[in-house]
Amino acid sequence: EITTRLVGSEMCIRDRSDSPNWSMVYNRQALGKSLDYVMLMAYDQVGRTSPVAGPTATLPWVETSIKNTLQSVPAEKVILGMPLYMRVWYEAANGKDLPKDLADWPAAVTETAVEAGTGTKQAAAAKAAAKKPKLFVRTLTLADSQAVRNKYKSSVVWDNALGLYKLDVQLPEGRLKIWFEDDKSLKEKVKLIPQYHLGGASFWRKGFEPANFWQGFAKHELT
């Protein structure tokens, strides 16, 4: 009845809950029967309030989220939501966050740093471990992430088990950790859409993407 009355329009419904169990409190089966589409927000695997650094959306976690949702919602109604962001996690030994401007971030500590008077990588790590570091976290958009990768490119590695690139590098006053989302990681997630016969894709959020992003991913969006 609502669909008939709202021809040419859209209505987004967000169920309310004060439960600490997050989305599992929702009656997904009832929602799946009543709604045209159910948006599965497959991101924030590790949220910004976490006391421990972690990824935004690893491939195994996303696939598990899909499987759990399909137990109560028809596949053709499920829209896979994917992140156009990640988080910068910085464990600061000196209790101070990294500068706002990437250009002011320090270089990674290497064995050759002795010549510059900054000590060895092991010494820096020992200094960071001497007292419990303070964890700082900030959001990094897909559009801005390439500059960070370029700065620390020798330390960025692909994690096949997680389905994404990650950075774990020692800096002079702390440790920097980022689990990157990019074209490769998102394409791996997109493969799950036809695999599980889902209704389409969505991304959070518009404005976080780099130029020309939609040329490769727009065909997967719900239209």
Label every PLM stretch briefly.
Residues E1-I13:
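Single conserved hydrophobic/aromatic residue that forms the stacking wall/gate
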Residues V38, L80, I193, A201:
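Conserved, mostly hydrophobic/aromatic
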Residues L192, G207-T223:
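Aromatic-rich peripheral "rim/lid" segments of glycoside hydrolase catalytic domains that contact
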Residues V25-T56:
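Aromatic- and acid-rich polysaccharide-binding/catalytic face
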Residues R14-D18, Y37, A42-R48, L84-W89, ...:
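Solvent-exposed loop/turn segments at secondary-structure junctions
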Residues S17-Q29, E63-N68:
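Alpha-helical scaffolding within the catalytic cores
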Residues V190, Y196-H197, W204-G207:
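C-terminal functional modules
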Residues L84-L192, E221-T223:
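Glycan-binding loop/region signatures in secreted carbohydrate-active enzymes
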